[in-house]
Amino acid sequence: MFSASPANRNIFTVSKLNHLARSVLESEIGQVWLSAEISNFVAASSGHWYFTLKDNRAQIKSAMFKGANRKVMTRPKEGDKVLVQANLSIYEPRGDYQLIVEHLEPEGEGQLKRQFEALKLALSAQGLFANENKQPLPDSISRIGVVTSATGAALHDILTVLKRRNPAVEVIIYPTQVQGANASRQICRSIEIANQRNEVDILIVGRGGGSLEDLWCFNEENVAWAIHYSVLPIVSAVGHEVDITIADFVADLRAPTPSAAAELVSQSQIEMLSALTAKRDRLYKNTRTLLKELHYQQQSLTQELNTYHPKNQLRQHMQRVDNQLTAITHNMTTRLMRAKQTCDSRISKLSQLSPKALLKEQQNTHNLLSQRLTQAWRRGVEQRHLKLANASHLLDTVSPLSTLARGYSITFKNDKVVKSQKDLAKGDVITNRFADGETKSTVN
């Protein structure tokens, strides 16, 4: 039956045969796409995944090494329907026929990704992702609205972070389904309710991690438009850092996780104290600068007030009156001296003529003229004194000091004269100035 001589036999070792089989499989069949169900899934401590791919008639062992499986957003579990791209191979030490998986995605995820890219392109063309449509976060946030599941881990993470950073901030929850067929409509309705109530400063819209199908409600077009039309600023917080949704592109700010969203919208107590300290220092500096400016203005106004004070004006008027009186007196004295000299000259001439009657007549005339001149001089002096007295009386009449001396007072508010009761209000501090001092009082 076995006629071949030993010399003509091509004898393999087991390892060589397995190696040859592996080479043939890898070179002849190469890479394949496979639709199957996950079974016997094991995640090794090395980071590699080992599982079985099966359908209702057959199964094949599979391995997905760490470098490839780190690209998978959601770890598969028993019973998951998946689509894989793999290389057919043999594990030589045991001769196990297996697949080396390079890419794995939930079955149907490819279609979802194509829908995602198409909607993303359409909404971008309509301007929903433009930076000019995004609102800035408020400077001061005291109330935060959260649109998410009331029982999900995302809400717990958000509340934990807010309690740690700023326990005083108020949180209003808008319970919403965040997975399933009705989720997108509920998310839109919650955003609409939050805007109608207008009871928060900002909204966090999101949920925890999951598969592409789990997060799909945040890729719906109606959710994108609800976020776009929101008057309240919205921070998206969907899944993990690697999860990107349409809601992230439309939102005013994207946070990689719900916890990160809480960090972004809350101000820690240390930050608040630092900000308040900086504001206090700026206020103190500005107040000192303002007080210095007001002090300089007060000094300037005081100097100007002293220049135009009625007392100084009266002194100047009195000095001018004294100068005028001196000039009048000097003028009258000069005229009298000249008249006397004229009389003396005439008397001398008359005495030289010697007629006694003429001399007597001239003497009488001299006496009469002298008397008239004296009377005229006296009347002139009296009239000047009377005018001076009238001028002094008039100055005393118009002087505020004279008014104060008669029992009156002048009321000031903020260094300005109060001219009417309409200038005063309850609580105003006023100053009443009298002839001998001043008092301060408060208007009741």
From Swiss-Prot:
It catalyses: Exonucleolytic cleavage in either 5'- to 3'- or 3'- to 5'-direction to yield nucleoside 5'-phosphates. NCBIfam families: xseA (TIGR00237). Keywords: Cytoplasm, Exonuclease, Hydrolase, Nuclease. GO terms for molecular function: exodeoxyribonuclease VII activity; nucleic acid binding. Belongs to the XseA family. GO terms for biological process: DNA catabolic process. Heterooligomer composed of large and small subunits. GO terms for cellular component: cytoplasm; exodeoxyribonuclease VII complex. HAMAP family: Exonuc_7_L (MF_00378). It is found in: Cytoplasm. The gene is xseA. It holds the Pfam family Exonuc_VII_L. PANTHER family: EXODEOXYRIBONUCLEASE 7 LARGE SUBUNIT (PTHR30008:SF0). It is an enzyme of class 3 (hydrolase). The keyword Iron does not apply. Its EC number is 3.1.11.6. The keyword Repeat does not apply. Bidirectionally degrades single-stranded DNA into large acid-insoluble oligonucleotides, which are then degraded further into small acid-soluble oligonucleotides. This is Exodeoxyribonuclease 7 large subunit. Its main location: cytoplasm. It comes from Pseudoalteromonas atlantica (strain T6c / ATCC BAA-1087).
